[in-house]
């Protein structure tokens, strides 16, 4: 009888232990992943992924945040609050140099800026003596424009540059002919063409950059960065996430109307009617980091020669590139 009681007690203890283990497993919380991206082409590129918010890997809960201003995005990254972010390519370098805790994992968009004019010009060489409007003095669109101008045999002093804070400010300027020539990105370019159908799209900065540098892709405009300490322990998730980003971009390019609907639902500021018309020239493309290391190195070298502060004080070393 005693033996039987002992056996029952042992069995009860074992069951209790197993139940305890099971409860602990059940109570294990999902890993929360914060993905931050700016309002504009990067959030358009990830719109399918953000709208569906699909389960990328069991045990992870992904939160997508669209930052409405560049300052908000910069603050989020520099405070290391984002596990994954899509940022301007120069901000990727700054984040690495300043925090040592972010790595470049891929590209979601190449150069989407265009030289447009109400005047009859054929290219960058024809800009001598003209006034050209652009966004952000000393920022990457300005530096890239000046690099292309110099490569076309002109001095930046040959051109009278005027600057505005955002691409949205360029649209009324050109549409009302307060400025006749400008460097305009998508999707603002599509909005401009609706207001001024006669505007001439003269050159793509990305295509011009490709010719000058002999690059296969052009210059990286939007970059996916991942937090290093998060990547170290969650590599499988990140690799799966990058595959989903690629699929999202393919879908967006192939289904502009649906992409416009998704963007509206996730809070992208651009109207869906503008989005679906802008995708043809938006240059959204996923390029894995292993395919674009040379492009980043070359672009950072160009930026550093104009203003080393634009990339955080120095060209990042090899550790900036994420390894799968």
Predicted regions and their residues:
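Bacterial N-terminal signal peptides that target proteins for export
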Residues: 1-9
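C-terminal motif of bacterial Sec signal peptides marking the signal peptidase cleavage site
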Residues: 17-20
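Bacterial signal peptide processing site
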Residues: 22-24
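Short, glycine-/small- and polar/acidic-enriched structural segments
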Residues: 26-154, 160-164, 180, 186, ...
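Short, solvent-exposed loop/beta-turn-alpha elements that line the ligand-binding surface or hinge
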Residues: 53-60, 206-217, 284-292
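Pocket-lining segment of extracytoplasmic ligand-binding domains
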Residues: 89-91, 169-262
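Secondary-structure end/capping motifs
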Residues: 231-306
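Conserved C-terminal helix/tail region of periplasmic/extracytoplasmic solute-binding proteins
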Residues: 297, 301-324
């Amino acid at each position: 009888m005693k033996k039987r009681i002992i056996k029952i007690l042992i069995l009860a203890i074992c069951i209790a232990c197993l139940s305890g283990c099971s409860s602990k497993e059940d109570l294990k919380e999902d890993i929360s992943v914060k993905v931050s991206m700016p309002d504009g082409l990067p959030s358009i590129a990830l719109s399918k992924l953000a709208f569906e918010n699909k389960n990328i890997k069991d045990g992870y809960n992904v939160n997508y945040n669209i930052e409405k201003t560049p300052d908000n995005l910069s603050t989020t990254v520099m405070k290391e609050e984002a596990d994954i972010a899509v940022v301007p390519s120069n901000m990727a370098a700054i984040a690495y140099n300043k925090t040592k805790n972010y790595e470049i994992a891929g590209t979601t968009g190449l150069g989407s800026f265009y030289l447009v004019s109400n005047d009859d010009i054929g290219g960058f060489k024809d800009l001598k003596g003209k006034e050209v409007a652009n966004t952000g003095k000393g920022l990457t669109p300005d530096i890239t424009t000046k690099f292309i101008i110099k490569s076309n045999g002109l001095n930046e002093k040959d051109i009278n540059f005027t600057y505005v804070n955002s691409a949205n400010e360029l649209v009324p300027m050109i549409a009302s002919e307060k400025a006749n020539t400008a460097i305009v990105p998508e999707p603002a370019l599509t909005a401009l063409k609706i207001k001024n159908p006669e505007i001439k799209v003269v050159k793509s900065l990305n295509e011009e950059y490709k010719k000058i540098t002999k690059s296969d892709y052009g210059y990286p405009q939007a970059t996916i960065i991942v937090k290093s300490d998060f990547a170290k322990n969650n590599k499988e998730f990140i690799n799966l996430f990058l595959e989903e980003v690629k699929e999202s971009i393919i879908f967006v390019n192939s289904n502009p109307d649906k992409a416009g609907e998704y963007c509206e639902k996730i809070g992208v500021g651009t109207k869906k009617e503008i989005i679906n018309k802008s995708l043809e020239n938006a240059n959204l493309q996923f390029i894995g980091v292993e395919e674009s290391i040379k492009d980043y190195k070359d672009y950072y070298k160009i930026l550093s020669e104009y203003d080393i502060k634009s990339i955080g004080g120095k060209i990042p070393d090899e550790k900036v590139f994420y390894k799968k």
